[in-house]
């Protein structure tokens, strides 16, 4: 889960925008408290969303606290108090981030590979701690990445088979409670992983074609240029299918807190990103390049 999940700020009420920022900052502090500063460098809106959904069954929201941090050393910022949802999101964030390092190490060459190796060394201790807390999730993520590497080596043209690996990774970090909620969350985050993988593949078409890197969208539609206008409709349909399944799963959750904020992200934010990527005008964080600020 890296980079595409975010709310539409213009449609948020002030208290909802504040709440999103508080959870983002709260997750940063939860990661720092358990894993140190290193992994806070890879904090994302995606895992902030995961924390919101994971904690949505709670009836009450604890009052926010005010803390200083590396990004704001002189002024205390409002942030969410650490709770079970933020701890879970912190653990999940470390697992997914470290395995991303491992994936880069396997895929990249030259300086990029050396940098990935450095990140793996720096992140190893935190990863071992997170793996001890979520061993089943770690094994599922590892197996999914192995399957993805095999598909990449085969130059598999199936978008569904390739996206399934990402889906299994995001679903792996869902709490294993054995109840109906787990099944709903598993389906929800499976489809979120599918959507993320395919949106990322569309976004990377030009780069992957230039570098001759694996991209199932390019292979499936036998693209000769980065222009997707001829295949936009089927791409849009497959992305909308995942969005529809995500929306249906959310409707089954009956969240008790942060429902409107989560709904903004699912029903507005993700469709907006889909359109922007297909139109070729998607920009990270609305083009400001300042991560962590709505």
Which residues are covered by each model-predicted region?
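Acidic catalytic motifs of isoprenoid enzymes
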Residues: 1-166, 170-187, 194, 198-242, ...
């Amino acid at each position: 889960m890296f980079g595409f999940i975010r709310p539409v700020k213009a449609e948020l009420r002030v208290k909802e925008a504040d709440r999103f920022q508080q959870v983002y900052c709260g997750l940063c502090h939860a990661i720092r408290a358990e894993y140190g500063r290193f992994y806070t460098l890879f904090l994302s809106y995606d895992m902030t969303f995961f924390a919101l959904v994971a904690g949505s069954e709670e009836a009450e929201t604890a009052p926010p606290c005010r803390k200083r941090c590396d990004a704001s050393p002189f002024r205390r910022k409002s942030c969410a108090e650490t709770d079970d949802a933020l701890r879970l999101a912190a653990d999940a964030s470390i697992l997914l981030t470290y395995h991303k390092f491992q994936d880069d190490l396997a895929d990249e060459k030259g300086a990029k590979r050396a940098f990935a190796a450095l990140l793996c060394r720096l992140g190893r201790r935190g990863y071992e701690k997170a793996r001890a807390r979520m061993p089943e999730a770690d094994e599922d993520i590892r197996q999914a990445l192995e399957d993805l590497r095999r598909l990449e080596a085969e130059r598999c043209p199936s978008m569904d088979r390739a996206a399934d690996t990402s889906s299994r990774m995001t679903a792996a970090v869902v709490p294993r409670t054995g109840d109906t909620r787990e099944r709903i969350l598993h389906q929800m985050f499976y489809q979120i992983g599918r959507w993320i993988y395919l949106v990322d593949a569309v976004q990377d078409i030009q780069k992957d074609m230039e570098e001759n890197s694996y991209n199932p969208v390019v292979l499936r539609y036998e693209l000769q240029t980065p222009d997707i206008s001829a295949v936009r409709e089927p791409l849009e349909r497959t992305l909308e299918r995942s969005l529809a399944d995500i929306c249906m799963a959310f409707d089954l959750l009956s969240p008790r807190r942060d429902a409107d904020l989560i709904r903004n992200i699912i029903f507005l934010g993700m469709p907006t990103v889909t359109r922007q990527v297909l139109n070729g005008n998607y920009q990270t964080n609305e083009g400001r390049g300042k991560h962590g600020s709505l």
